[in-house]
Amino acid sequence: MKNINPTQTSAWQALQKHYDEMKDVTIAELFANDSDRFAKFSATFDDLMLVDFSKNRITEETLAKLQDLAKETDLAGAIKSMFSGEKINRTEDRAVLHVALRNRSNTPIIVDGKDVMPEVNAVLEKMKTFSQAIISGQWKGYTGKAITDVVNIGIGGSDLGPFMVTEALRPYKNHLNMHFVSNVDGTHIAEVLKKVNPETTLFLVASKTFTTQETMTNAHSARDWFLKTAGDEKHVAKHFAALSTNVKAVGEFGIDTANMFEFWDWVGGRYSLWSAIGLSIILSVGFDNFVELLSGAHAMDKHFSTTPTEKNLPILLALIGIWYNNFFGAETEAILPYDQYMHRFAAYLQQGNMESNGKYVDRNGNAVDYQTGPIIWGEPGTNGQHAFYQLIHQGTKMVPCDFIAPAITHNPLSDHHQKLLSNFFAQTEALAFGKSREVVEQEYRDQGKDPAQLEHVVPFKVFEGNRPTNSILLREITPFSLGALIALYEHKIFTQGVILNIFTFDQWGVELGKQLANRILPELGDDKAISSHDSSTNGLINRYKAWRA
């Protein structure tokens, strides 16, 4: 990968000039001037996903200039580097190969002179055998009963991805009850343990190193709870499995290392749902559906790695995002899935994007003087319409939005889905075109009211419009289409990181807080007043000690 400061490219300079020409152009004008705008600014993936980016403040010239930026920053070379197993995570000297985990074509992918695919396939086969034993009831707990509940204990990528996918694919789930515990707050594990029976519960401990503070604290509490009933430590092996690489620590915990599922240092946490970390997904929806999830992602991987830039969906979405973030000064992006099963999708992408591209140092080690990753947030529609859409429609901040919806619902109840989709279509239209003062006044006339007498209200009912959106319409949310959708966003994030000259696959920003927490923890063990920190931290700790006494 080349380290190129994007602001020093001729494409960036051209985009700055172009922004001056575009900043006052409205989406309404762009549609009025081009009856084919939708056809030109939308694309379909595999007849499963329609991506409409026509309601953006862009022209063909905008996209051409953004594509020039991708060329000048050698995006094509970076894509080749990632897919070929080059160690593009240079701060940790690691390859970045979540694409290998879903490489259904099974073509060799070489890291350090070795094809990783045989090991990937071996772990998949092991997961298949294990999951079939659990799901079929062949696997018995210590009292001879089949497993009914699975508790996944992990945090970050070991929780957000599997939790999001198992929720999104609930229509495909089997009889097993899935639970996810992440927070070190004892309330999280305590509330889950109230719902399960030690005789019929399987715990998955998801920690690559088997040292993650939150995960191991919860795992030990789960083990203690289990042994209060089971008694004999040898029973732990029937009720705990590990998603880890630390054979010694897993064995010491009491887990049979035959039930330890490995993954590799070239799998980043927030890209790990495709790996052994996805075992909870398999236990929820079955191995065949997990393979479909992998296959959908692999199809998007092929699209991303082989499709020209001008038709490449992850690249186009990434470029449009850079346009708003760096030229219009937009600080956030809203992810708005119109599907209740997708209620964890925004939280998943929040980590995927913000932990990847929330960096202020470029790949040369210098502080950047441009914007990097945006703030990602969102909630399912239509809930968000009754919460924060007010600001998106009439606030002073530009919030580019991605609207996501399936054409076919898994729950065709009455006319619920038509009502949901009518809102999905209406919101992007309203955000793009708004409502003028003239229309507001005419509405009053149509109601037999005199606008002059309502002058004090009229300004508040005007919508400026010109708020940009992308619409992603899926035929249906299936394991395959969900896999493709997740991979679409993964590659969008990667593309932005390449162009912005930052390292997308490390996360040093999570370390400092952990270090300080480890230093503070022993200080909380007694009632002595603390004076070793700044006055604020000392004051907070000392008040905590006083109140807990």
Curated annotation (Swiss-Prot):
UniProt key word Isomerase = yes
Catalytic residues identified in the record: 355 (proton donor), 386, 514
Supply the enzyme class, top level. isomerase
EC number in record: 5.3.1.9
Q: Keywords on this record?
A: Cytoplasm, Gluconeogenesis, Glycolysis, Isomerase
Q: Where in the cell is it found?
A: Cytoplasm
* Pathway it works in: Carbohydrate biosynthesis; gluconeogenesis; Carbohydrate degradation; glycolysis; D-glyceraldehyde 3-phosphate and glycerone phosphate from D-glucose: step 2/4
Q: Which InterPro entries match?
A: G6P_Isomerase, G6P_Isomerase_C, Phosphoglucose_isomerase_CS, SIS_dom_sf, SIS_PGI_1, SIS_PGI_2
> Gene3D superfamilies per the record?
1.10.1390.10, Glucose-6-phosphate isomerase like protein, domain 1
What does UniProt give as GO cellular component? cytosol
* One Gene Ontology molecular-function label: glucose-6-phosphate isomerase activity
Q: Which GO terms describe its biological process?
A: gluconeogenesis; glucose 6-phosphate metabolic process; glycolytic process
**Known NCBIfam families for this protein?**
PRK00179.1 (NF001211)
The record's function comment reads: Catalyzes the reversible isomerization of glucose-6-phosphate to fructose-6-phosphate.
Q: Which family does it belong to?
A: Belongs to the GPI family.
Q: What is this protein called?
A: Glucose-6-phosphate isomerase
Q: Which organism is it from?
A: Salmonella choleraesuis (strain SC-B67)
**Which gene is the coding source of this polypeptide chain?**
pgi
